UniProtKB/Swiss-Prot annotation:
Its main location: membrane. Residues 36-59, 107-141 are extracellular. Keywords: Cell membrane, Membrane, Transmembrane, Transmembrane helix. Homodimer and heterodimers. Belongs to the Casparian strip membrane proteins (CASP) family. Residues 1-14, 81-85, 163-178 are cytoplasmic. The chain crosses the membrane at residues 15-35, 60-80, 86-106, 142-162. It comes from Sorghum bicolor (Sorghum). It comes from the Eukaryota. This is CASP-like protein 1U1. The lineage of its organism: Eukaryota, Viridiplantae, Streptophyta, Embryophyta, Tracheophyta. It is a multi-pass membrane protein. GO terms for cellular component: plasma membrane.
Amino acid sequence: MAEEVWKALSLLFRIAALGLSLAAAIVMATASQLVIGGGGGHESSSYSVSFGQYNALRYFVAAGAISAVCSAAALYLFAVRADFTVVVVSLPLVPVLDAAAQGFLFSAAGAAFATRDVVGGGTSAGRGSSVCDAAGAFCGRVTVAAAVCAFAAVSVATAALASRDAGGGSSEGRRFEW
């Protein structure tokens, strides 16, 4: 019975990780804002701020999409191929996919948080204004996407730990003996 509980918990967190990584990539890919600034007189200037202007945020979208693919593949293999006979270069594939998804998600979240701090002026910037002063909604979306991405990474880690404790016939209830 305990093995079924661990497997159900792992499935739950795998589904959550897939949804959260997709949501983070979508929120970041739609992060843009038109900023209208006053020119002092009757003139006004405007410019657009978008995730595509920052390499780290473009990496975020790509990493989120790649981790979603890794999470979907791991979910399929975990749920459908319960015997875990799928191995690549003598390593079980599900833990490799879990590790890849975690790596992409944690690095993407870090890149987004760092970019948000740099774009937002940070504490060490010493400037009077930043992009986030004028485009607060853009920076808000970047922050939300980074937080969702971090939660997705934690979900993948929890799913991996739960699947490891699910048992499955190997010694001491451990499924993946590296």
